[in-house]
């Protein structure tokens, strides 16, 4: 059977559900797919147990259970990620296995914000999730309107505390379970027949309006991490790699950044699959011929970038998830002064971890396998790093942690 072609008629957005365990994230994910399927036969209804039985995936050497559900509103196409366990959320957000352009925070109206509600908001901030909308679930269990308002106020304060615009974040109160049940009874229910189903439509209207369309990788400034270098007699030096973002044309100037002092050069040729190209775009694996560059001047781990767009750094703060021993991580804790390898884009660089900071701003003496922690790192060579960049921590060739740069310090 021929594969269905992916139609690009609408803007595509990646979103996900976050929030405390048992507040209804997976039920809401199922309800959204069911409600949208009721007005659009191209949307496939996903049942709760299909989403809950999340397949294992590997991202940066870490196994994560995530479910991907696809659906569309009249305005946009969405890929929605839902993780069954709390640890899977932490790992997913730190490795960026499934990027989120926006998150739906699910809070049970019956319980109010709980510890993981707080932790997921903090994580969303630190890994750079740009916007949040809130779904107050299980609203059918609350008879008192004032109680709902109190929970909303509490969540708004929590969002403001972690630098989200708590005052303006959209809130919808509803019941994911009752909406899902109504759709299972009447799969073409549509709008206006059930108040709980209408609440899900209202939520998706908010998501459509409030989450901005992300800038496409191709519209960003050019960057390519160098994977390999070789020289072609009589023509010069070629750097190969995958273009991470932006576009590059023959004749343009690029900077070679990281490991050594930054140098500037001109692109004299581009090749892909042994064919010459006029322009390389985000996602392409290309060979870039560079004018006047010797093979020894450039190595794996450096990046080619638009001049002035990225600078080398060696000191940063990062949010890190440390693998436990079942995940193939360390069996023992580590302490300040630990010097593992930091795998940044295409290369390992040794770094010294000088201090650990807990969520409440205090300092930790040591870090155990399975912990999530903020740490300060100093690399022995400066490399091209920027806020929001992901990396792996390795020791003897195996991954012992995954992190994201939360702040540049030098």
Curated annotation (Swiss-Prot):
The keyword Nucleotide-binding applies. Its EC number is 3.6.5.3. It is an enzyme of class 3 (hydrolase). It is found in: Plastid, Chloroplast. Its main location: plastid. InterPro entries: EF-Tu_GTP-bd (IPR041709), EF-Tu_GTPase (IPR050055), EFTu-like_2 (IPR004161), EFTU_2 (IPR033720), G_TR_CS (IPR031157), P-loop_NTPase (IPR027417), Small_GTP-bd (IPR005225), T_Tr_GTP-bd_dom (IPR000795). Residues 10-215 form the tr-type G domain. GO terms for cellular component: chloroplast; cytosol. CDD domains: EF_Tu, EFTU_II, EFTU_III. This is Elongation factor Tu, chloroplastic. Keywords: Chloroplast, Elongation factor, GTP-binding, Hydrolase, Magnesium, Metal-binding, Nucleotide-binding, Plastid, Protein biosynthesis. The gene is tufA. Belongs to the TRAFAC class translation factor GTPase superfamily. Classic translation factor GTPase family. EF-Tu/EF-1A subfamily. Residues 61-65 are annotated as: G2. The lineage of its organism: Eukaryota, Rhodophyta, Bangiophyceae, Cyanidiales, Cyanidiaceae. Residues 175-177 are annotated as: G5. GTP binds at residues 19-26, 82-86, 137-140. SUPFAM superfamilies: EF-Tu/eEF-1alpha/eIF2-gamma C-terminal domain, P-loop containing nucleoside triphosphate hydrolases, Translation proteins. Mg(2+) binds at residue 26. Transmembrane segments: none annotated. Residues 82-85 are annotated as: G3. One of its GO terms (molecular function) is GTP binding. GTP hydrolase that promotes the GTP-dependent binding of aminoacyl-tRNA to the A-site of ribosomes during protein biosynthesis. Residues 137-140 are annotated as: G4. Residues 19-26 are annotated as: G1. It holds the Pfam family GTP_EFTU.
């Amino acid at each position: 059977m021929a594969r269905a072609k992916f139609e690009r008629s609408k803007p595509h957005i990646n979103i996900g559900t976050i929030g405390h365990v048992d507040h209804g994230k997976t039920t809401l994910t199922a309800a959204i797919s069911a409600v949208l399927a009721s007005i659009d036969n191209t949307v496939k209804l996903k049942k709760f147990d299909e989403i809950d039985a999340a397949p294992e995936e590997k991202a940066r050497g870490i196994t994560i259970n995530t479910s991907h559900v696809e659906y569309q509103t009249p305005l946009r196409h969405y890929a929605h990620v839902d993780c069954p366990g709390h640890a899977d959320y932490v790992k997913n957000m730190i490795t960026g296995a499934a990027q989120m352009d926006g998150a739906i925070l699910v809070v049970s109206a019956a319980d109010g914000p709980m510890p993981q509600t707080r932790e997921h908001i903090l994580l969303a901030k630190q890994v750079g999730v740009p916007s949040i909308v809130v779904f107050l679930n299980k609203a059918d269990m609350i008879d008192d309107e004032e109680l709902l308002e109190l929970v909303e106020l509490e969540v708004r304060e929590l969002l403001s505390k972690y630098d989200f615009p708590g005052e303006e974040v959209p809130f919808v109160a509803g019941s994911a379970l009752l909406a899902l049940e109504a759709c299972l009874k009447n799969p073409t229910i549509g709008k206006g027949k059930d108040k709980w189903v209408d609440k899900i439509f209202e939520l998706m209207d908010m998501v459509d309006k409030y989450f901005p369309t992300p800038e496409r990788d191709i519209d960003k400034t050019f960057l390519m991490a160098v994977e390999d270098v070789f020289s072609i007699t009589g023509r010069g030096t070629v750097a190969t790699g995958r273009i991470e973002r932006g576009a590059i044309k023959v004749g343009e100037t690029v900077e070679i950044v990281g490991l050594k002092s930054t140098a500037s050069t001109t692109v004299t040729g581009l090749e892909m699959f042994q064919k010459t190209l006029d322009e390389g775009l985000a996602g392409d694996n290309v060979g870039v011929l560079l004018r006047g560059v010797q093979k020894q001047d450039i190595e794996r781990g450096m990046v080619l970038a638009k001049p002035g767009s990225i600078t080398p750094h060696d000191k940063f703060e990062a949010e890190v998830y440390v693998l436990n021993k079942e995940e193939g991580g360390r069996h023992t804790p580590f302490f300040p002064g630990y010097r593992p390898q930091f795998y940044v884009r295409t290369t390992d660089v040794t770094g010294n971890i000088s201090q650990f900071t807990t969520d409440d701003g205090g300092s930790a003496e040591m870090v155990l396998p399975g912990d999530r922690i903020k740490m300060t790192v100093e690399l022995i060579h400066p490399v091209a790093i920027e806020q929001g960049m992901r990396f792996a921590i390795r020791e003897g060739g195996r991954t012992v942690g995954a992190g994201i740069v939360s702040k540049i310090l030098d």
